[in-house]
Amino acid sequence: MNKWQELTIEVNREVEEAASNILIESGSQGVTIDDSADYLENADRFGELYPEVEQVETVKITAYYPESADIEDITKQVNDRLDELTDFGLETGDINLVTQELVEEDWAENWKKYYEPARITHDLTIVPSWTDYEASVGEKIIKLDPGMAFGTGTHPTTKMSLFALEQVLRGGETVIDVGTGSGVLSIASSLLGAKEIYAYDLDDVAVRVAQENIDMNPGMENIHVATGDLLKGVTQEADVIVANILADILIHLTEDAYRLVKDEGYLIMSGIISEKWDMVREWAEKAGFLLETHMVQGEWNACVFKKTDDISGVIGG
């Protein structure tokens, strides 16, 4: 049995994914997320009665560190990086950080009880890597290790990205995944029939984690992962470019995306809070794209833009 140190932060729901990434990048071995919205969404799934739960606007994210980690220094670094999120227009709310030691707690195994297989779209189900799961006819399985980094793939921004990929992929496409994180969108693209997938992330941790997740899923030799800063220096053309990152970063890839997307190809963007949606749409349309689909889940937005001269199938066309 090992000793672990626990750091719990409470922040506004809109920064859940960014805050989780900050904790992972600070050396956490994994995170768990306590969100009342998830409880309420799933509470009546089996027709059972549950205690009343009030949905609040904050989430609690708990990160776990080895006993040897300098938790005081980590706490300071995490707090500083959370403060920086306001530079991207994100409101963290009143940040609350609490630390404690878990005595003789083998968290490396115990935390797994929080994660179960989740059907995300009509075809795609995300399954924790340690779980035996028998797929139904037509069901496509994505094996992930949520303890590595970047959550479980069930965040609204990821869900909408997966829905969009199902919408546009028909088989044989080349896909570029910008800011790949866990690699979930690349794995999904392969399962949905893409021929070649190129996944980029600026963070070396993400590149490693993505590759490890990809290796867990058979038949993913068509996914190529590399360190990259958005689309800078990329010359490979693509039928689809997908990016699930912050809105203030998305706007800086729209011109390069238009250069790389083939005629009649698509740009999928997610991770956009509602107040930033108009800005992202303006930048994409300025680059030359036409809006085909706009999705909203809570305060999050996702979109599918098309590189086309045919306005009949686009919004406003």
Swiss-Prot record:
Catalytic activity, as annotated: L-lysyl-[protein] + 3 S-adenosyl-L-methionine = N(6),N(6),N(6)-trimethyl-L-lysyl-[protein] + 3 S-adenosyl-L-homocysteine + 3 H(+)
Annotated GO MF terms: protein-lysine N-methyltransferase activity
Keywords of the record: Cytoplasm, Methyltransferase, S-adenosyl-L-methionine, Transferase
GO biological process: methylation
InterPro entries: Ribosomal_L11_MeTrfase_PrmA, Ribosomal_PrmA_MeTrfase, SAM-dependent_MTases_sf
Binding residue positions for S-adenosyl-L-methionine: T158, G179, D201, N244
Organism per entry: Streptococcus thermophilus (strain ATCC BAA-491 / LMD-9)
Gene from which the chain derives: prmA
Key word Chaperone present: no
Family: Belongs to the methyltransferase superfamily. PrmA family.
A single GO cellular-component term on record: cytoplasm
EC number(s) from the headed UniProt entry: 2.1.1.-
Purpose: Methylates ribosomal protein L11.
Name this protein carries in UniProt: Ribosomal protein L11 methyltransferase
First-listed, main subcellular location of the protein, grouped into a coarse class: cytoplasm
Locations listed in the record: Cytoplasm
